Swiss-Prot record:
Species whose genome carries this gene: Thauera aromatica
MF annotations from Gene Ontology: benzylsuccinate synthase activity
Sequence ranges assigned to domain Glycine radical in this UniProt record: 731-850
Name the UniProt record assigns to this protein: Benzylsuccinate synthase alpha subunit
Induction: Induced by toluene, probably via the TdiR/TdiS two-component regulatory system.
Subunit structure: Heterohexamer composed of 2 alpha subunits, 2 beta subunits and 2 gamma subunits.
Task of the protein: Catalyzes the addition of fumarate to the methyl group of toluene, leading to the formation of benzylsuccinate.
Regulation: Activated by the benzylsuccinate synthase activating enzyme BssD. Rapidly inactivated by oxygen.
Modified residue annotations for Glycine radical: G825
Reactions catalysed according to its record: toluene + fumarate = 2-benzylsuccinate
Recorded superkingdom: Bacteria
Length: 861
């Protein structure tokens, strides 16, 4: 590594030599290629042969990846055969047909088994969701084969698709605007994108046989109620839909048990007739025993729990319906089974290192999991497979530290195996034990870009606040409010046996303030990308005599866009309730089971989040306009519009003035006061006037993922000095790349000024590699985190990777396959990201800590 960095602090010279002296021998531009350390040779082999499904610029990074046809074929077969039956039962039979007839996949070395397509290089498609998304695959090199059959399937499903069912409820003009993905993210019914928090707890604690018994008891009770004298139609007829839902739950659960037992038979056949290695043969027989029992029965040990959870994940996220995510409180969920196997050794006894290996194997299964996302989502998650994100840490229902040895096993496995997925959210509380915090730090220090950190206590408060709007008065209790996870990158939601989020149309999707500001300046017209009217006619900027007129024009554009975006989600939710029932997910939820309702329809805990992305470009632009045009009157709005139309060409001095105007992230009230007002009054205030399907206000949770690149490329030049087509700000409240010039604690102070209705925004920070890898690294990071917590900031995530190493990877990508970076809400292998995206990460300031920063953090070195 490079020469040792030093700093004078509190009267002494502090040296930041590597904590591990051997790192001094490693060239700085190849550090991360030396950090992988799988716990066993098996996981080393599994990683070497992993069939990654990462995509960038809409294309898959690895050769041989393609869409499979089995799921869509078998779903279509069932849909045709069940004409005339109630929709929930049709959906259950569709799942059953897939599980009964689909090809099973069993791979060498794996212990956790199960895949969701007919080949490990394949992924399924979902013609029942978006006809546009599937049609795009059919026109690509990833088309399922036979192509003629695939086209016939898509044609069959088009009138039945979620997209086709939703479109008639919108003005075609509004739809066309939404499909541009410039002012708002494409409607959920057009993208097919989804997310869910499966109630894993009921599967592991009860087993599916118990869920079947519950549903059958409910059916018997309902029939008895319907037969009572005197007949009362208003209440009696309500049982009909409930009975259909319970019947569908039974069909779905029985199908999943049978599918798991098909895996058991396959493992037994391979062991008894084909496997020659005695050790692997015994292992296959053990897997067969587990699959015979799981998920039919309650889990008893850690191997049981891991396999049962994996089967549940596949059904909920890939087979019954597509859903992004890997949402779960994994350490709390698995702790009883870790305790049984590792500590008490009462069932499936093992050592801690064996638990670490199991987690490494799960991480590789997730890395291999393919998702048939639309092209738009393959573009906006550059370098990603899908947004697989789990949650750790935080506090228990009684407020005590929730960290345990399972938490540490997950973090250790993560550090060792070095995969981009699943990403991890850590709920930071000052109650968390130091041992676990050290593991969190080491993962961050080693450049994984995660765990990202969420404020534990703020999350609990958010769950309790959302609970106030519960439609049936059964929102989160104070104890349940502690059991929250991130649904995807940023939005928190309850996990557990009941009240978890079941569909993306509850919370998610995005709105783009930078583009909205651009069209606000042009009477609602998008001149730089779509070349069409994108919003209401609110006037031309050159005619705005005051800044308040501009502010109010933006408010109207924002109101139009956010109302359209939320309406898209709620219309989609309504059609999901009618035609896209999820009988398996419903069977796992105690509320759905009790009430006989489908998971899409039941909403006990509102979770209405929506993502403003590119907010800082818009905010910085408003600051510059106010200062240079309305306050100082150095320029006129007409001059600014001419400069923007010219992409600043010929207006270089003027651009310098706008670029040098006060910027967010420097603890400068000349920027921070107006931008804080922008966040609280417009982005949050106007959004919260909208009430979603669940009865609660929609709240902002800015999380850029890769949309800051995609939308940046569709946004013309902006008054903050940005050129047209350049990437926007990379978080939800992160400073624009390279403009945070006053150090890491100035960023914290700026962000902390936004308090009202704005506590769910992504903050990206890039920290000094020498400082983080020194013996002082943990102490500085820990003090930073405690300060962040005290400032009541919701989120932060870190890149700890040098510019030198990233540029080396650009020159010789084949030598840097293990270099991982945080993009925004997810991590990716640097070499899988397009150059445009790579350069946005290089452009982020690498924050050093000076003496003033350390004093503000009150750190002792």
């Amino acid at each position: 590594m490079s020469d040792v960095q030093t700093l004078e602090y509190k009267g002494k010279v502090v040296q930041f030599a590597p904590e591990n002296p051997r790192e001094a021998e490693i060239p700085a531009d190849e550090l991360h290629e030396h950090l992988q350390n799988p716990s066993t040779e098996r996981t080393r082999r599994l990683k070497a042969r992993c069939r990654w499904k990462h995509a960038a610029a809409g294309e898959f990074c690895e050769k041989g990846v393609t869409a499979g046809i089995e799921r869509m074929r078998l779903l279509t077969e069932s849909h045709w055969a069940t004409r005339g039956e109630p929709e929930p039962i049709r959906r259950a039979h569709g799942l059953k047909n897939i599980l009964d007839k689909s090809t099973l996949v069993l791979q060498t070395d794996e212990f956790i088994v199960g895949y969701h397509a007919e080949d490990p290089n394949m992924f399924p498609l979902y013609p029942e969701l978006s006809y546009m998304a599937v049609q795009d695959y059919l026109k690509s090199k990833y088309s399922p084969q036979p192509a003629k059959e695939a086209q016939e399937i898509v044609d069959y499903w088009k009138p039945f698709s979620l997209q086709a069912r939703c479109e008639p409820y919108f003005d075609p003009v509004d739809l066309h605007r939404g499909y541009q993905v410039s002012t708002i993210e494409g409607p959920v019914f057009a993208t097919g994108y989804n997310s869910v928090i499966p109630p894993y707890e009921t599967v592991l604690e009860d087993g599916l046989q118990a869920r079947i018994a519950l549903a059958e008891e409910k059916i018997e009770h309902a029939r008895a109620e319907m037969e009572k004298f005197p007949w009362h139609a208003p209440s009696g007829l309500e049982w009909i839909d409930k009975i259909d839902n319970w019947k569908a739950m039974v069909i779905a659960c029985k199908a999943v048990i049978a599918w798991a037992r098909r895996h058991a038979r396959l493992c037994k056949i391979v062991a008894e007739h084909f496997e020659t290695d005695p050790k692997r043969k015994a292992e296959l027989l053990e897997i067969a025993d587990i699959c015979q029992r799981m998920p039919a029965e309650p889990a008893r040990g850690l191997k049981d729990a891991m396999q049962s959870k994996w089967f549940t994940f596949l059904i909920c996220h890939a087979i019954e319906r597509y859903a992004s995510g890997f949402a779960q409180k994994e350490d709390s969920l698995l702790w009883p089974y870790y305790k049984a196997s590792v500590i008490d050794k009462t069932f499936q006894p093992m050592e801690h290192k064996d638990a670490v290996e199991l987690i490494e194997m799960e991480r590789l299964k997730v890395s291999e999991h393919g998702a048939g996302k639309s092209r738009a989502y393959r573009e906006i998650f550059p370098g990603s497979n899908d947004l697989f994100i789990l949650t750790l840490g935080g506090t228990n229902g009684d407020g005590s530290d929730a960290c345990n040895d399972m938490t540490d096993a997950i973090l250790e496995a993560t550090k060792r195996i070095r995969t981009t997925e699943p990403s991890i959210v850590f709920r930071y509380s000052k109650k968390n034990r130091a041992k676990t915090l050290r593991w969190v730090f080491e993962c961050i220090r080693d450049g994984l870009g995660y765990p990202s950190i969420k404020h534990n206590e703020l999350g609990v408060q958010q769950m309790l606040e959302m609970a106030k709007y519960s439609r049936n008065g059964n929102g989160a209790t104070p104890e349940e409010a502690h059991y929250w996870v991130n649904v995807l990158c940023m939005a928190p939601g309850l996990a557990g046996r009941r009240k978890a989020q079941k569909t993306r149309s509850e919370g998610g999707s995005a709105i783009f303030p930078a583009k909205l500001l651009e069209i606000t300046l042009n009477n609602g017209y998008d001149w730089s990308y779509a070349d069409m009217q994108m919003g209401p006619e609110t006037g031309y900027a050159k005619d705005f005599a005051t800044f308040d007129q501009l502010w109010e024009a933006f408010r109207k554009q924002y109101q139009y866009a956010i109302a359209l975006a939320i309406r898209c989600k709620d219309v989609s939710r309504t059609m999901e309730c009618r035609f896209l029932q999820m009988p398996f997910v419903s069977a796992l939820d105690d509320g759905c089971m009790e009430l006989g309702m489908d998971a899409n329809a039941l909403s006990e805990q509102p979770n209405g989040w929506h993502n403003p992305i590119t907010s800082i470009v818009a905010g910085n632009s408003l600051v510059a306009i106010k200062k240079l045009i309305y306050d100082e009157k150095k320029y006129t709005m007409a001059q600014l519009m001419d400069a923007l139309q010219a992409n600043w060409e010929g207006y270089e001095e003027m651009r310098r003035d706008f670029k040098n105007a006060p910027k967010w992230g420097n603890d400068d009230d000349d920027a921070d006061v107006l931008i804080s007002r922008f966040y609280e009054e417009i982005l949050g205030g106007e959004m919260m006037k909208n009430i979603n399907y669940s009865g609660g206000p929609v709240k902002p949770t800015g999380q850029a993922v890769g949309l800051y690149m995609e939308v940046g490329s569709r946004t013309g030049p902006t008054p903050d000095g940005r050129f047209g087509g350049e990437a926007a700000d990379d978080g939800g409240i992160s400073p624009y790349s390279g403009t945070d010039k006053k150090g890491p604690t100035a960023v914290l102070r700026s962000v902390s000024k936004v308090q009202k209705n704005q506590k769910a925004n992504l903050l990206n920070q890039r920290l000094s590699v020498p400082i983080m890898r020194s013996k002082h690294g943990f102490d500085i990071w820990h003090a930073y985190m405690d300060t962040w917590h005290d400032l009541n900031i919701d989120h932060v995530q870190f890149n700890v990777v040098s510019t030198e190493e990233m540029k080396a990877a650009q020159r010789e990508p084949e030598k840097h396959q293990d270099l991982i970076v945080r993009v925004s809400g997810f991590s990716a292998r640097f070499v899988d990201i397009p150059t445009y995206g790579q350069n946005t990460i290089i452009a982020r300031n690498e924050q050093n800590f000076n003496a003033q920063d350390l004093e503000f953090l009150n750190v002792e070195l």
